[in-house]
């Protein structure tokens, strides 16, 4: 997630009353370390303000790691039924669609978890290099494409967020690497070549801008899900 993407999402959540927002399900949450140390702006802009409001947030991921409240896969019907019983009012689904081979099926499942009037916050890369964590389908949807992934919803807000290039990012967005260190790494392809390819794929963004798509959707009363 980009820093400005986290800020945008946090600002939109702040506008929604507690009774309409909570409980919130953070789908594909990753770990506490990732949210607070690897990308601390996620905690700062999204989850710390939500916690200050006293709302319930469930972090769901397939990884049984610290900071994951619910471990499982929504493609498992029994697990999906368990999550449905939690009666969440909103879902955050960030940086997840491009990891899914059957994203349309998962999107239908996510919509089915929400009541009519429930909120869905969706964001992900628009212009971004390949991210093999563990896979990347290179799905880089526009605003309209994201909306079409969730039939039975209407759009409340949307943006293409310009995260700038390498020179504009903070240390967390650079993965802890300085520009000088990155240039030096590009000069040593013979050392750990798999890691070198990761850096090489990102190198155009020393000049090009990373962008993200973000939308806020609400489930219709007449939704088929």
List where the protein language model places each region.
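Short, flexible hinge/linker loops that cap or flank conserved catalytic cores
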Residues: 18, 51, 207-208
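S-adenosyl-L-methionine-dependent methyltransferase catalytic module, highlighting the catalytic core
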Residues: 101-109, 119-225
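Short, conserved clusters of charged catalytic residues that mark active-site
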Residues: 4-8, 41-42, 105, 141
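Conserved SAM-binding loop
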Residues: 22-132, 147, 217
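Short secondary-structure capping/turn segments at boundaries of alpha-helices and beta-strands
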Residues: 12-14, 45-46, 202
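S-adenosyl-L-methionine-dependent nucleic acid methyltransferase catalytic domains
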Residues: 18-21, 88, 115, 136-138, ...
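Class I SAM-dependent methyltransferase Rossmann-like catalytic core
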Residues: 1-21
